[in-house]
Amino acid sequence: MYEADSKYRQGLLIWMSHACWPSYTWQCYDYYFEPTAAFFGARKACEPLHIQRNALTRSIEVVNRTADNYKDLVATRELLDIRGNIVRVDSNMVNSNGDSTVELAALATDSVPGNIDGTVYYIRLRLADSNNATLSTNFYVLSTDEGNLQQLATLPQVNVAASVKRPSGNGMTLTLRNTASTPAMMIRLNLKTGDGCQVLPVDYSDNYFHLMPGEERTVNIRWDNADARQQVPFVELTGYNVEHCVLK
């Protein structure tokens, strides 16, 4: 479905994209057209030019699904501890030809330092051009004890600072910043009307994401006024360890 036009790939099919009845599992968007975290993960993975961690080899790869060749790119891998402190940074120059996957030998393994506090750590990836413009990013929550993420439960609650702009009657632009010294994990944005009902469907430029200390992200939201029942909606912000707040 996504890779069928590639010379070296046989195609990829999602099973399944949506549920035919209300369900908590097996869907990228649910019965009511709400996009799940899986939707945003799949969309990230399908970027035309993409940086990723190969879970099997633990190497970092640059995937180019376009027909263009990119020269003098810089791939950066940051290892962070559970508190979001950077403990190691590695970079690698890379050329990416069209319809190719390049493994970065200099970033072959995670090489987790022994001074990581506990088991949980993060990997933050960035692919930039020769002018340092960001082309792709990625983020992974991992553990030295594979699959054991229980240490995340020790993270304290944090507040996320936000500013809201309404450039149009059916759109909002949110700028979110983590001003705390602790990561804000799995931030979820949920558009609602004054009576507390969800607005669906909604187009979020991003959702279900993490913000490290000091990190900022801009999210654009669009909807149809008919789906908001002609009301002025607001955004409910929640997260794994994020204090609930309302953005108007």
What are these regions (language model features)?
Residues 223-225:
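Short beta-strand-to-loop capping motifs
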Residues 240:
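Conserved recognition-core residues within compact binding domains
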Residues 244-246:
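Eukaryote-biased activation of long, low-complexity terminal tails and linkers
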